Amino acid sequence: MRVTRNVRIMAGAPLAAAALIALGAGDASAAIPVNKPMSGKATYYNDAGFGACGTQINAGNQMLVAVSHAWWTTANPNNDPLCKGISVKVTYQGKTITVPVRDKCPSCANTHLDLSQPAFARLAPLGQGVINGLTWQFVKTGFAGETVPISEPIVGSTIG
């Protein structure tokens, strides 16, 4: 390829990107199904650093959950509705925990949760590695972390 052709292609790239963003930002939206029980599985992780919500996390010693990339609806995950007071209530063999969404699991299917190590340990021994057959649901939590029942879905827009 010649340099002049590359320059012309690159000059048009910002316009093409803007058009794609405008098309993607249209009617595309996804609702977080708050208070809708789902069946699935859980694994655990113990990474530390910045979570998808833009805050420092330590999955080795904090109670939190990473949910599937499929539930995230904004280009900037820091602004995603999942980071605005959404938790996951998980029940397995008579034990229930409620943990805040703080991270994204890029390899998880939409019914697969990646719990922090201490959250997983409250439900099953770490040596088990995977919990199959659990039930879980998104819940809205208040400022003090308490679960607040709501019936309306929380909606966010998607790009692409």
Segments (PLM) and residue ranges:
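Secreted/periplasmic proteins
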Residues: 2-14, 19-160
